[in-house]
């Protein structure tokens, strides 16, 4: 049986991978959005693990709120990405300063 430490290590590894993904790739908007989603997944893994091992369902309920916010964040991020690609024909983060007014 897996202990709480196993799930926390998994969450920490996922979080570290997402941090590395953001810092190593600062140009592509899609990769940055995927890394942020992975970061939220790592946090949700820790919430579910603590909720299960403490016998409380509040952590699992909170995961649904985090998933809702993550879905809204992904939708807004992809909308910005589509706007960027339509106006500039690129998805580089460095070109975001050209989207004015």
Swiss-Prot record:
Subunit structure: NDH-1 is composed of 14 different subunits. Subunits NuoA, H, J, K, L, M, N constitute the membrane sector of the complex.
Annotated family: Belongs to the complex I subunit 4L family.
Any one of the GO BP annotations: ATP synthesis coupled electron transport
UniProt function note: NDH-1 shuttles electrons from NADH, via FMN and iron-sulfur (Fe-S) centers, to quinones in the respiratory chain. The immediate electron acceptor for the enzyme in this species is believed to be ubiquinone. Couples the redox reaction to proton translocation (for every two electrons transferred, four hydrogen ions are translocated across the cytoplasmic membrane), and thus conserves the redox energy in a proton gradient.
Gene name of the record: nuoK
Keyword Transport belongs to the record: yes
Reaction(s) this enzyme catalyzes, per UniProt: a quinone + NADH + 5 H(+)(in) = a quinol + NAD(+) + 4 H(+)(out)
One Gene Ontology term of the molecular function aspect: quinone binding
The protein's name: NADH-quinone oxidoreductase subunit K
UniProt KW keywords: Cell inner membrane, Cell membrane, Membrane, NAD, Quinone, Translocase, Transmembrane, Transmembrane helix, Transport, Ubiquinone
Keyword NAD assigned: yes
């Amino acid at each position: 049986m897996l202990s709480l430490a196993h799930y926390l290590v998994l969450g920490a590894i996922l979080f570290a991978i997402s941090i590395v993904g953001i810092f190593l790739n600062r140009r592509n908007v899609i990769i940055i959005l995927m890394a942020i989603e992975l970061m939220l997944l790592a946090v949700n893994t820790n919430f579910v693990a603590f909720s299960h091992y403490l016998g409380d369902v509040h952590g699992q309920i909170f995961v649904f709120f985090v998933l809702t916010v993550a879905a809204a964040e992904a939708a807004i991020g992809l909308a910005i990405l589509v706007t960027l690609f339509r106006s500039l024909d690129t998805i580089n983060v460095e070109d975001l300063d050209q989207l004015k007014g």
